[in-house]
Amino acid sequence: GFLSPSRREVDMAITLSPAASPRLIVEPLTPYQLAHYAAPEHIAQHGAPERVDDLPRFDIVGYVDDLIYAPELHYLDEIRPNLRPRLASSSIRAQRDMIAAGGGIGVLPCFLAEGLTRVLPDQVLIERRFWLSTHREVHGTARLKAARRWIKALCRDAAERLSPLPD
């Protein structure tokens, strides 16, 4: 599993959803965007969907449904109900590698999509947010304040990579 700041296994965590513990101070960190992508070679060989309703006819890459650990990762159903992956992994990096190798079309954070081609650009854009949680007991310490400032500065500097697409 994951390390938990509420159990003091770590002092700080970046998560996909806000933690719900009174022991934590939770703050929004940064928004980020996800979109459908495919390898250029995959599109050249198989074409690209023109509409969301075309997606079931294509090889979809996504998460192993039973291993999705956060509701924010259930985005295939947001795009089209009952859309299921033919290739699946619990790792977003493995999904990116499958897509880059021509395994199909999949949803990726835009910051992981370098070298890939966006699919359905006018129809699919998902917006999410990263959250920063710190244990209440150490939230005000100098080292955690410095770490939070540094992480927030990194996110500000990377804002265009995290959310590069117009709404």
Language-model regions, residue ranges each:
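A bilobed periplasmic-binding-protein/Venus flytrap-type ligand-binding module shared by bacterial periplasmic
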Residues: F130-A142
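Short, well-ordered secondary-structure micro-motifs within conserved domains or adaptor modules
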Residues: V10-T15
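Short amphipathic alpha-helical coupling segments at ligand-binding clamshell hinges
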Residues: H139-A153, A158-A159
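C-terminal regulatory
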Residues: S4-R7, A19-F130, D157-D167
